Design a protein with these regions (language model features):
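Single conserved hydrophobic/aromatic residue that forms the stacking wall/gate
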Residues: 2-13
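Long, charge-rich, low-complexity alpha-helical segments
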Residues: 29-125, 129-145, 159-164, 347
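A broadly conserved sequence feature marking short terminus-proximal activation segments
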Residues: 79, 284-333
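Core AdoMet radical
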Residues: 113-128, 137-157, 165-184, 191-205, ...
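Non-catalytic interaction/Regulatory regions outside core domains
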Residues: 206-259, 366-375
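A C-terminal junction/extension of Radical SAM enzymes
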Residues: 234-308, 351-353
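C-terminal accessory region of radical SAM enzymes
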Residues: 260-278, 310-355
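Iron-sulfur (Fe-S) cluster-binding segments and ferredoxin-like electron-carrier domains
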Residues: 312, 351-375
Length: 375
């Protein structure tokens, strides 16, 4: 008789099981009920990652083949019972905050709740009160990532905000259209970068001027091409090659009538999901938080604050402290803790291997932007 142990992360859903090695991304997927039963026993906390394997079960060719694969992928092993004085113990990774989404006060009791905050996006137009905004930012004085949307040069005291952020943070981004790029003072360039959004088709004269302008600024920049069709993708590739653009993204947009384009080009397949190596920390992180949204806030020009523009507002800079805003989002918000705990994702083998739910999911109104459970 032998003891069998597993060193991979394992999940069992109904009649399927997945073992995943977070060190190299290798995996074993099985629908064999005999193997699934063994895995269930291994994953049971009281068994401490090790179960007894009687000889008659080990002699089963399917079980033996599985164990050989387990060993070859360094995801588990078998140990002769006679070589051990007692049952071996293996510490399996378990999530400490299993009921976090039921007991969100566990998050709110953090010694410094504001440590969860990492990024603020600020929208500017001629209605914004810059002095009130700066006063609000000073109330917590954290070294965060700041994104600025809008041209501060047309706003009274707008330059005060840019000066303040230049002193407060080394990670500031000017998000703007390629048709209008605000000019930064030379003294601030080291603490700012441009994120230039390109809607297609482009005005080629403006695009040419923008590329020349950015090359002259000696400041980091990235182009974000907003694509809604295959034609947009082709044009983006043409522009990238023409202007020798190194840093760029192709970001899909939903227009209500391009779902077939998105389904064909952005929906994940099973192969896509398993092609990227994911760390154990990332997998457990996605049990608790939305990796794309957690820690991010948006401040509109009227002072309203959101965790996600597609969700309800959390408050306003004139009436709510940043602590109240963060606490509210954690306790009753819809964005930071939005995970794949709803159907069909909660019944899927890849629930926490998949990326966190995205804004595209919200806009389309479909949680599973994949082909795994849509067959």
């Amino acid at each position: 008789r032998d003891d069998v142990e597993s060193r991979g992360l394992g999940d069992v859903y109904k009649r399927q099981a997945l073992l995943y090695n977070t060190l190299d991304g290798k995996y074993i997927k099985t629908c064999n009920l005999k193997i699934i039963q063994i895995l269930k026993e291994i994953l049971c906390e009281k068994n401490c990652g090790v179960v007894l394997l009687p000889q008659h079960i080990y002699d089963d060719i399917e079980i033996k083949t599985f164990i050989n694969e387990l060993q070859s992928k360094f995801m588990g092993d078998i140990i002769e019972v006679s070589l051990s004085e007692g049952k071996p113990v293996q510490i399996l990774p378990y999530l400490n905050y299993k009921d976090l989404h039921k007991n969100k006060h566990q998050f709110s009791s953090l010694e410094n709740l504001l440590q969860t905050l990492c990024e603020i996006t600020i929208y500017l137009d001629n209605t914004v009160n810059i002095k009130t905004l700066i006063e609000y930012l000073r109330s917590f004085s954290l070294n965060l990532t700041y994104n600025i949307i809008g041209d501060w040069k047309d706003i009274p005291h707008g330059s005060l905000l840019i000066d303040y952020l230049g002193q407060m943070s080394y990670s500031n981004y000017i998000q703007c259209s390629y048709t209008h790029i605000p000019l930064l003072e030379s003294s601030l360039k080291k603490n700012f970068s441009y994120q230039v959004y390109v809607s297609l088709p482009v005005d080629h004269s403006l695009m040419n001027n923008t590329c020349i302008f950015l090359d002259q600024q000696k400041i980091p920049f990235q182009y974000i091409f907003q694509v809604t069709s295959l034609e947009d993708c082709n044009e983006a590739v043409t522009l990238i090659e023409k202007y020798d653009i190194d840093k760029y993204q192709l970001r899909p947009l939903y227009t209500k009538d391009n779902i077939s384009f998105l389904a064909k080009n952005t929906f994940l397949t099973e192969e896509d999901i398993l092609s990227t190596k994911i760390s154990m920390k990332d997998i457990f992180r996605k049990h608790i938080i939305n990796k794309d949204n957690f820690g991010k806030l948006f401040i509109l020009s009227n002072g309203d604050i959101y965790a996600n523009i597609l969700h309800k507002k959390l408050g306003n800079i004139k009436t709510d402290s940043i602590y109240q805003i963060v606490k509210k989002e954690i306790e009753i918000g819809e964005s930071w803790l939005r995970i794949r705990n709803q159907k069909p994702c909660c019944d899927c083998l890849y629930q926490y291997i998949c990326p966190s739910p995205s804004d595209l999911d919200l806009m389309i109104g479909q949680l599973n932007l994949c082909t795994v459970n849509n067959k």
